[in-house]
Amino acid sequence: MRHPVRTLLLTCVCILVACKPRDPWITPTPIPPGYDFPGSREEIQQWADAWNTARITPKAWNLWAGLHADSGQVYPGTGLPMPIWDTWNGEELFPAPDQPTPDVSRRKATHGFHGPRQFHHPAGSGPVVTPTDQLVSFNKFNPEMAAYLTQGHPAAPGGPSFFYNRFTSLADLNSQWPANTPTAQRTVQQAPYTAPSAGNRGSAAMELKPVLYLVKKQKPTPVPVWRGLAGSVNSDTTCTPEQQEADKCHPTPSLWLTCAIVDPTAPADAPIEEATPEQIQGVAPLIDQVNSAHPGSAILSCEHYLHTPLSALYSFQMTADEAKAFNSTNIEGLQAEAGDYAVLTAMHVNTKELANWTWQTFWWQPGSDAPDDFPGSKKGMTDKVTGAGRNYAMCTAYNQTQGRGSSKMTVCFNPYLETSPNIPLGVQSNCMTCHGTAAVASAFANTASSPPATWVLQTPSYPCDYKAPINFATYPWFTGFTTTDFSWAIPADPQPLPQNPNNLPSPATLNCP
């Protein structure tokens, strides 16, 4: 005999379980074979010492291709293929003080947007300027780097372990050094690298900083496009050699005169071409909406327009939670909604294939390259780069100078990031010199302008200039600090504390003169 009540109860339970939203999980996936990663450290160092860009450039492009290889996983809700890089763990590896370290073997399929942290560096060269650019960012770490960040590391054999993903542990690490410890020894353990050998692919830690803009799901949306220093507002007066030397040249994306009308309604095979008057008129209301949100300081300065399909750059659709996170980053102007697109406009990429890491940075460059290929270009791109990836430019910094023994400094910056006025001499910078100054003190600073307090570890300034290479083993500004193996993520990504845990004084070497 059947029991109607029991049957009804079981049916209701089954329906509730079936209808309950499930957290989709993504498995972090390494770059597959075939993309020259990782390479031989000895060989790559020889290229860097000889400034052998004929070998460095294709290696960097193959790395770009490998990052965007199909992971075999999809974006939940859309079923669209997910590239390798987006399977990797992000800043969830830095848990709140009372929370356990997350499982690095999987991640939730969401993105934690925030403004680029270098725009708010706690030890800058001057007053922090509020950005007016419509971009967000986050960090990504390949499986080797994720394991490194979440495991304990002793400062000396047999000693206590310190965790590089928590501020209190980093402060304790810095405090335990004897007073006479040389600068070169006041450091975290090096991120992992294993050389390839017969029968072993090898491995190397990797960090990424993707930078994304918003494109509305059903509306063509303008996105600034870099056209060199001369392609920004008033560049003839603000970016002269004298103004550059005085750190007055900061052509941020909000000042760029060229914009691409990214059209989600255009066919995927539509060409990148000059926009028509009708297409330009179509985005005028959006531009007015964006600029009216910040009177007196334009967010978009478009005067020349391209028209591109959405397929011309990498993108994914945002969930409602991601749209909310996007809108919470204090971005003025357009507001994101579920289904809108986050489009990849830039990405910093660094790998532990060198002791000082390899450095390459990519930015969206539809159409022609910037004048004088500054600071980089699409030249030398390999056939492994396909699809939207071929619309990005790149520069590399495998050495601080253009070869060992050279006095000519490398210039390699990302136009979407290092043009910020909060970054000293960004248009003269290079990735290796900048990241080489990453370090933590034991003292904390409150970075909140109003309650509640957000206490973070103090760090040294970014380099004050790029006139000469830094000797990181003897750099005097590291007095009182522990260097973090060229990773600004280690000093920047741990969760802030609600109160100062130690009330220690700040180091003497904190800001640029």
What are these regions (language model features)?
Residues 1-9:
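Bacterial N-terminal signal peptides that target proteins for export
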Residues 20-433, 438-513:
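Conserved small-residue
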Residues 12-19:
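Hydrophobic h-region of N-terminal signal peptides that target proteins for export
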